[in-house]
Amino acid sequence: MYQVVASDLDGTLLSPDHTLSPYAKEPLKLLTARGINFVFATGRHHVDVGQIRDNLEIKSYMITSNGARVHDLDGNLIFAHNLDRDIASDLFGVVNDNPDIITNVYRDDEWFMNRHRPEEMRFFKEAVFKYALYEPGLLEPEGVSKVFFTCDSHEQLLPLEQAINARWGDRVNVSFSTLTCLEVMAGGVSKGHALEAVAKKLGYSLKDCIAFGDGMNDAEMLSMAGKGCIMGSAHQRLKDLHPELEVIGTNADDAVPHYLRKLYLS
């Protein structure tokens, strides 16, 4: 039996409308009441995820910003790995002139965007988290957990992914959380490495963990955990990268809570 359950949120545990269904909430409460450790493992910001956790009324670790931040059961920050200042500063303005690509910055407790995009707020059904606008040359690049780029066209983000990797190499970890969202963290940052740290803190190892995800930002976590489950609606790139992993149903079908009920509660 896996003692640690780690799950991504968007595209995985959350419904397509970015909410937690009642069917999803119940097993999380039952699992944690039985002593199984649930871990949120997401690209979302810790301020946002903390509200989701509090609304659920469960104790859980939070891996946020794709592993750049880890908070304990009481919400205390126990791990932080920021982008180097020079990289963060350059990323703030790298596509500022492209009207099709929005630049987002997570810095400590704040979220910044380089221009308004009201539709981003559709992700915040379970929490209240608002962005502020920034000017690239005026934003202090200290404490930046990640910079991410959103665009309706995946094809426009592909050359940006290649350019960032070519420029900074292993000083960054670049991955697509969705086809329309390219995320940049410091080198060595991943949900998988953060999960390893959390498991160790709990007295377990990665082999005691089961993980669920749908994005390329879940790749390390899914492959490093004792059991990794890929969502049926996941990027094909992720399925191709890890053909050895089990593919389950979709978030529209509440596949993760179904799986957890069968594994732990039946």
Swiss-Prot record:
Phosphate binds at residues 9, 42-43, 191, 217. Mg(2+) binds at residues 8, 10, 214. Keywords: Hydrolase, Magnesium, Metal-binding. SUPFAM superfamilies: HAD-like (SSF56784). Its EC number is 3.1.3.74, 3.1.3.23. Magnesium. Can also use other divalent metal cations as manganese, cobalt or zinc. One of its GO terms (molecular function) is magnesium ion binding. Its cofactor is Mg(2+); Mn(2+); Co(2+); Zn(2+). The active site is at 8 (nucleophile). Catalyzes the dephosphorylation of pyridoxal-phosphate (PLP) and sugar phosphate. This is Pyridoxal phosphate phosphatase YigL.
